């Protein structure tokens, strides 16, 4: 059977141009090439466009398309004539096309590099960012086809279209002639166009998540009539949480006369609901999900939470079901959390959404929580609840997402939402896998600059249900790159909660200086030792003795906080001894009172056998309880009644200064084909009015809670992470610059690379080619002359000049001086011949050893510099000392390319063996500025030429003055595709 691709004029159908996109309002659409089979769709699309929009497109009244027009707009060669369409529900909502032109605007073919571009967007979908997204995609297509410049003619009154072009960030020229505005712009991405694209990406993806977390109406599909079952549980959780919007129970098995389930309107299908549905929670078996998705899409549901299992986690068949699920949902513009998801929670008083399997609503607070695993998610909610104390506060949860297989909505999307969410101050994430490390690193850097981001990443293999890009980088390298991006990387969920509590409750420390005080000398010394081990600078502990009273603690803490030589205070406490024993509440109040004047310094408590103190510290100063909050037994143990005790108005905390709106899904949205339209001017299912939001502002005066830890190492580890993060925040304000070097020959290097790649798609360069390429970037490599015979070695030494080194370069001996395959400081021919004989007698004939002779470099510290382009993480620069010991210990530091001058300085000092470069134990310090310059030059080479996919300089001898590169290898290959520089797309399925 002939396909549309077979019937195109010249080229096969370019399926790689197909993409799913997120629109400005958070909905989705599909972009694809227009084919000859789209004639009817095109005509139907055009009939729904207003006369005004048609006039703007054709500069004259144009009520309908002629047969000739339809043929022209559906027949493309995908080179000189290209058309793309944005579709929702399989129908066109917008089109864009380009036609290659030559001088005078006449039709042309390659190598002409200019094209005329034109758009048409249905009026119902204008304002959703469709044209802006299509411009990104048609520009990428044009660049692929050798077009470097677009021209567009627009009527002056068509301000929307003019704005699409001018806001895109491309370098452009504008002229006015014969009543028409002519815009011309280069398609080469600029810093501004990339910034515009990423800002649009952030807004669109954040809104798509916001629509899932702030629905005005929720339908739970799969609610049984009898108690029990997943659907019934979720419905009960939504009711118990006090969801402020409309709830619906859906089950195709309901009898016709059933009107309600637990007081919630009941329907056999989503299509039967009289009114819009913003979010559907799908709790039916996997085999029933496709029909449910169709019903939801036809009704205009905006998003799905799919709890059903039986997808990619179950094997190849399930993986295909998962792909089809995502494709099916995106056809209707819906986003999915799941499948195999645990659900979502939003504690905002204007929403109060618990669309999850969590039995009770978490305490409202300022922590955003993401977990791919439902089991880990419930454990994290439980731990935050147990250690949060009180009933509301900074250490409660703002929003919670458990994405399951994260087939669609991922941690990247939720990061986009939390980045500018005013109700979230700290982000905690448990990641079993990272689908797009390059994007995650970029988003993490931006998020961490605004609020702390703490991550636990599983070090093992990704679960079966997760789509993960292949990476050659070790887990430790990925962790190092995340730290470079400002991520607080911890190893366990205990450390995740420990760090999260400190960051949510206390200010960031200004430095590493720590005061320690308490009523136990032993516990104080233990804390002191842990501070030293974590790289902090503790002062000698102040021992208040075991008879210390709350007043003694208050006085000592106040004095420590007032001391300018202190950046943070750790209070240690054990049970008091003797008749003067005091209650935990009194001590907690004394500490809290002293900490209120902390002047921006964090306070932590380490306690032994004082569980009551930890609870009292968390509960100190607490205010009115929030209705429908988590009962103490919510996650195991005895359950208590959920009824809140009435409080007087005086006990109620002030409302948060910027409460999140209850729901705003209607802004800018359009009705999908087949959807139920809302009444004119009506909002989508407004939630019940809310008079106050009990979630307190992050820094409310007098309400700061002090985190308590049952072990010194846990408290100090959390503090150390806060210190490093605070330092990163300060340094991120000025990340440094990428230096320019006058002796770099970028053009010459590009020409050489192009010539070399003509031999094949991937090759490792020979010695001369490597030296030639590196030389164009000011990186000289010491000559190493092959010496297959003693006479050849003597001749090479005469050419190079004594003293020389003789090295075996066989793979099993290369860079292994510890095995004895290197002889140094050979001052004359006699020494050289003796060394040659020793090597061949010890290791075998020259044919196996591959000996080379090299002139001796100045003595110094042997190091290794590497750069590699990883398909998932991007370009990475690595540095470490040479030798087996460093390799075994994994003592290597990493930075993302391009590297700035500050990055290079930090990179050199990041390895544990860095003291060897700076005069350790009386040795001579080496030339680290020259080493940093070498790192910067390698970074420039790889950044300027993505065809350079791997560089290794080993060894690099760093001497007292200068560096010597004694060995180098370079690998070239066609550059891997970079989706971070292309048009905005959702992950392909």
Question: Predicted segment positions?
Answer:
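Long, contiguous binding/interaction regions
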Residues: 1-211, 215, 239
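Catalytic-core regions of core metabolic enzymes
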Residues: 188-989
């Amino acid at each position: 059977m002939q396909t549309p691709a077979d019937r195109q004029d010249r080229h096969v159908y370019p399926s790689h141009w197909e993409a799913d996109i997120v629109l400005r309002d958070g909905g989705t659409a599909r972009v694809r090439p227009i084919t000859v089979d789209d004639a009817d769709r095109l005509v139907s699309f055009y009939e729904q466009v207003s006369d005004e929009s048609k006039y703007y497109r054709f500069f004259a009244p144009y009520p309908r398309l002629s047969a000739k027009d339809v043929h022209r707009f559906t027949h493309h060669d995908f080179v000189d004539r290209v058309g793309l369409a944005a579709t929702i529900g399989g129908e066109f909502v917008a089109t864009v096309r380009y036609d290659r032109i030559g001088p005078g605007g006449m039709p042309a073919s390659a190598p002409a590099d200019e094209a005329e571009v034109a758009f048409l967007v249905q009026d119902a979908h204008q304002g959703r960012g469709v044209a802006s997204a299509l411009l990104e995609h048609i520009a990428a297509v044009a660049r692929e086809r050798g077009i470097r410049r677009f021209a567009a003619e627009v009527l002056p009154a068509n301000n929307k279209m003019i704005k699409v072009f001018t806001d895109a960030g491309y370098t452009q020229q504008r002229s006015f002639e014969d009543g028409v505005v002519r815009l011309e712009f280069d398609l080469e991405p600029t810093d501004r166009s990339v910034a515009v694209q990423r800002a649009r990406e952030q807004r669109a993806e954040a809104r798509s998540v916001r629509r899932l977390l702030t629905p005005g109406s929720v339908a739970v599909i799969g609610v049984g009539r009898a108690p029990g079952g997943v659907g019934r549980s979720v419905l009960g959780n939504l009711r118990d949480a006090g969801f402020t919007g409309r709830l619906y129970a859906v089950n195709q098995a309901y009898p016709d006369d059933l009107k309600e389930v637990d007081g919630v309107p009941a329907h056999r299908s989503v299509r039967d609901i009289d009114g819009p549905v913003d979010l559907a929670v799908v709790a039916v078996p996997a085999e029933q999900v496709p029909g449910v998705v169709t019903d939801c899409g036809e009704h205009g549901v905006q998003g799905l939470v799919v709890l059903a299992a039986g997808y990619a986690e179950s094997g190849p068949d399930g993986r295909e079901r998962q792909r089809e699920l995502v494709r099916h949902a995106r056809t209707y513009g819906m986003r999915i959390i799941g499948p195999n998801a645990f659900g979502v929670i939003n504690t905002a008083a204007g929403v109060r959404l618990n669309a999850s399997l969590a039995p009770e609503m978490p305490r409202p607070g300022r922590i955003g929580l993401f977990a791919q695993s439902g089991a880990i998610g419930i454990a994290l909610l439980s731990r935050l609840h147990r250690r949060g104390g009180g009933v509301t506060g900074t250490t409660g949860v703002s929003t919670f997402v458990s994405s399951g297989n994260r087939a669609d909505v991922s941690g990247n999307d939720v990061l986009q939402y939390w980045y500018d969410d005013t109700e979230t101050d700290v982000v905690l994430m448990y990641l079993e896998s990272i689908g797009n490390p390059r994007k995650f690193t970029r988003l993490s850097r931006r998020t961490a600059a605004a609020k702390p981001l703490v991550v636990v990443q599983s070090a093992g293999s990704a679960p079966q249900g997760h789509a993960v890009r292949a990476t050659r980088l070790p887990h430790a390298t990925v962790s190092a790159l995340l730290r470079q991006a400002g991520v607080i990387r911890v190893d366990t969920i205990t450390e995740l909660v420990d760090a999260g509590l400190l960051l949510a409750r206390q200010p960031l420390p200004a430095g590493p200086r720590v005061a320690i005080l308490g009523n136990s000398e032993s516990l104080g010394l233990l804390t002191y030792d842990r501070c030293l081990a974590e790289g902090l600078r503790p002062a000698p502990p102040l021992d208040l003795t075991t008879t210390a009273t709350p007043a003694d603690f208050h006085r000592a803490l106040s004095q420590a906080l007032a001391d300018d030589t202190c950046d943070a205070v750790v209070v240690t406490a054990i049970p008091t001894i003797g008749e003067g024993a005091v209650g935990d509440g009194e001590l907690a109040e004394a500490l809290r009172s002293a900490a209120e004047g902390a002047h921006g310094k964090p306070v932590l408590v380490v306690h032994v056998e004082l569980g009551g103190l930890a609870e009292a510290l968390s509960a100190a100063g607490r205010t009115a309880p929030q209705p429908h909050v988590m009962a103490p037994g919510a996650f195991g143990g005895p359950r208590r009644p959920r009824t809140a005790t009435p409080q007087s108005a005086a006990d109620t905390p002030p409302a948060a200064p910027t409460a999140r709106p209850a729901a705003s899904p209607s802004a800018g949205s359009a009705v999908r084909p087949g959807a139920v339209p809302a009444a004119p001017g009506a909002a989508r299912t407004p939630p019940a009015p809310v008079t106050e939001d009990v979630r307190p502002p992050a820094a409310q005066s007098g309400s700061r809670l002090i985190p308590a830890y049952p072990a010194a190492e846990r408290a100090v580890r959390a503090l150390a992470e806060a210190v490093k993060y605070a330092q990163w925040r300060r340094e991120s304000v000025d990340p440094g610059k990428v230096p320019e070097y006058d002796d770099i020959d970028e053009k010459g290097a590009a020409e050489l690379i192009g010539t070399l790649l003509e031999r094949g798609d991937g090759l490792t360069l020979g010695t001369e080619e490597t030296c030639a390429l590196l030389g164009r970037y000011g990186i000289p490599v010491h000559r190493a002359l092959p010496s297959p015979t003693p006479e050849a070695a003597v001749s090479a030494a005469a050419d190079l000049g004594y003293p020389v080194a003789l090295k075996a370069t066989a793979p099993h001996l290369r860079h292994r001086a510890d095995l004895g395959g290197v002889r140094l400081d050979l001052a004359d021919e006699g020494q050289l011949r003796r060394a040659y004989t020793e090597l061949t007698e010890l290791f075998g004939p020259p044919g196996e050893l591959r000996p080379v002779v090299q002139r001796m470099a100045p003595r110094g510290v042997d190091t290794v510099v590497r750069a590699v382009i990883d398909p998932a993480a991007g370009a990475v620069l690595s540095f470490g000392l040479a030798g087996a010991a460093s390799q075994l210990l994994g003592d290597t530091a990493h930075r993302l390319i391009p590297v700035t001058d500050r990055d290079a300085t930090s990179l050199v000092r990041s390895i544990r063996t860095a003291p060897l470069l700076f005069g350790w134990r009386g040795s001579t310090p080496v030339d680290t500025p020259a080493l940093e310059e070498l790192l910067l030059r390698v970074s420039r080479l790889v950044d300027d030429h993505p065809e350079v996919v791997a560089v290794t300089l080993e060894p690099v001898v760093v001497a007292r003055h200068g560096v010597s590169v004694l060995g180098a290898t370079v690998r070239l290959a066609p550059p891997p595709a970079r989706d971070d520089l292309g048009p905005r797309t959702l992950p392909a399925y």
